[in-house]
């Protein structure tokens, strides 16, 4: 073994104040070996040189442009429309979420496929201690109902749509088949409908639509069973199949997790959406990427 001090030739003063910077170090074979070609990476590491600086709030950079057109806010109207230069987004008052979204006349979210709160995933081997409770509490069949709303055009030109949404299943269910059988059956307990004190989420959702077409969601999610272990918590939505190219800035390209991620570096990665799926014989964790700064579908 030998040691050597190497000076990396970069200038601190040339770095952007808002950007983050990493240094990637690789040790490669100098010549072809029986087991690998010349240039094969034997070891590598990524070092953080500088963290990203604070960026302006979206309200500071997205508030310029033509005044937004707001309609559908009268009592009895169920669909609210917000139109701007080159885009239109509609909201379903009864669900408290986006109903459809178009940019330049092209649907990005088709009618009825907007974001919904979701707390379910397929169970894997490590879930044998608690997966039955997901179905007992109806996580597989949440129904979303806005119980109040507030809509207002702001002085800065944006539009705010605030909803309180209750998410609860009609009833619980029993899942049979166990963890390892490969076959499971969900039996709905429709004879025992849920009441107000059964499990539910209550979410305060604030949507802000800006003149340039940016849409921001702030969500505060609570439940009446704070000790219930959830398999996941987030939002799901459907987009047209043609958006099959996936680009993200985060750890990759191999899927990684909070306890197994350091081998995958933070870079801009590109993949097909279909290639993020691995067809395991039984459900297993896959497709996750840690420390993602942004992602895009095209």
Language model segments and positions:
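Intrinsically disordered, low-complexity Pro/Gly/Ser/Thr-rich segments with frequent PxxP/GP/PP motifs
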Residues: 1-28, 32-37
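Beta-strand/loop-rich accessory regions of lumenal/periplasmic or secreted enzymes
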Residues: 12-18, 33, 47-298
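Terminal amphipathic helices with adjacent charged low-complexity linkers/tails
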Residues: 40-42
């Amino acid at each position: 073994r030998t040691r050597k001090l190497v000076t990396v030739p970069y200038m601190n003063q040339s770095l952007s104040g808002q950007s983050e910077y990493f240094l990637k170090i690789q040790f490669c074979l100098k010549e072809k070996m029986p087991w690998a070609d010349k240039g094969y990476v034997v070891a590598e590491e990524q070092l953080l040189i500088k963290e990203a600086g604070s960026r302006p709030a979206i309200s500071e950079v997205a508030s310029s442009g033509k005044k937004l057109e707001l309609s559908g806010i009268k009592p009895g109207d169920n669909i609210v429309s917000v139109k701007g230069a080159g885009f239109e987004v509609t909201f379903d008052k009864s669900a408290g979420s986006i109903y459809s979204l178009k940019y330049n006349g092209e649907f990005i979210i088709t009618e009825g496929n907007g974001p919904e709160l979701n707390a379910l995933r397929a169970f894997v081997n490590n879930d044998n201690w608690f997966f039955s409770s997901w179905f007992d509490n109806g996580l597989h069949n949440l129904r979303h109902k806005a119980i109040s709303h507030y809509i207002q055009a702001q002085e800065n030109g944006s539009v705010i749509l605030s909803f309180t949404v209750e998410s609860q299943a009609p009833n619980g269910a029993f899942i049979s088949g166990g963890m390892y059988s490969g076959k499971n059956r969900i039996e709905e307990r429709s004879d025992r409908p849920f009441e107000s004190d059964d499990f539910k989420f209550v979410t305060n959702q604030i949507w802000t639509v800006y003149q340039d077409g940016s849409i921001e969601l702030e969500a505060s999610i609570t439940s009446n069973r704070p000790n219930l272990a959830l398999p996941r918590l987030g939002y799901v939505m459907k987009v047209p199949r043609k958006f099959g190219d996936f680009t993200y800035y985060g750890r990759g390209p191999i899927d990684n997790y909070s306890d197994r991620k350091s081998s995958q570096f933070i870079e801009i990665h590109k993949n097909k959406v279909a290639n993020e799926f691995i067809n395991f014989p039984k459900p297993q964790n896959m497709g996750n990427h840690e420390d993602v700064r942004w992602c895009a579908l095209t």
